[in-house]
């Protein structure tokens, strides 16, 4: 709701050949639909591809970047994801590898030091433009009572598919019209759910934290039904940056003068209020993915993995954790006795 991505996309519209790279299929779809109103645009994600003849702009998820292509203008969105242990390497690859005359990198304030460090490593010049929220964000005084306090324009936030479906089911049994968003929702259904809420055919949306990644939805109030999330390793309290990212979706500029945020208990509301008032901790890590050049080596997998293990990058770089790949490899080897299995074959099996 501060307009940084909006301004970057306005510049992208001027490109003869441009690309938008975002974190979500839904976000790629949103940009594709907006761009398509004005100019030929294609969309590429891991799940679907819409190719328009003579398209000037591609809207894609960040993993789909083809670094062999050249662009006039590129937009890399939500670059604070560069520290993410699972997907961050895709932002590292995009920032270091994209071939564009002009690059707009949209991020939260806490990511500026590591991103500008990467730019400096490339000996490129940069300019920092800061944007501020255009609508006031108000933390409510009283905790939210479910389902009595549900109102039109609410977004109820949980962190698992099961919780999304449970809460949506309860609301529907109360006679409310509900949209849902979660990561594994098929693209066509996900698109339909967003459309229903955007067009106010449903009054409430129940979502995981995917809603925080820049989706431009007519949300009046964010309700944190939970304040803990499982991050792949442990269940932990939400970080200040995560709370602010999600809460920031409330009060869409142009529809509301204010956005509201609340939680389901006095302790939860105090926690959300505290996190919103806490400064984000600066990012200190840049995630490195498994290099494609190693995949092209005509060597046994053991040799290639040993090469990767021996690489010790200097800060702020950190290698992606390939523990799960190694565990899978050991399992395959114990079953198949394929000690000389090539890495490309192994990746195909995976």
Please name every model-derived segment:
Residues 7-12, 86, 90, 97, ...:
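Conserved interdomain hinge at the start of the Helicase C-terminal
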Residues 16-31, 104-106, 112, 148-174, ...:
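Conserved strand-helix element at the start of the C-terminal RecA-like helicase core
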Residues 18, 80-138:
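Post-DEXD/H (motif II) to motif III coupling segment of the RecA-like Helicase ATP-binding lobe
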Residues 26-71:
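Inter-Walker segment of RecA-like/P-loop motor cores
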Residues 33, 42-54, 166, 177-208:
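Conserved helicase ATPase core of P-loop NTP-dependent helicases/translocases
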Residues 53-73, 197-216:
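Conserved two-lobed SF2 helicase motor
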Residues 101-112, 199-201, 217-280:
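Conserved segment of the helicase C-terminal RecA-like domain
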Residues 279-350:
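Accessory helical-bundle/CTD segments and flexible terminal tails appended to RecA-like ATPase motors
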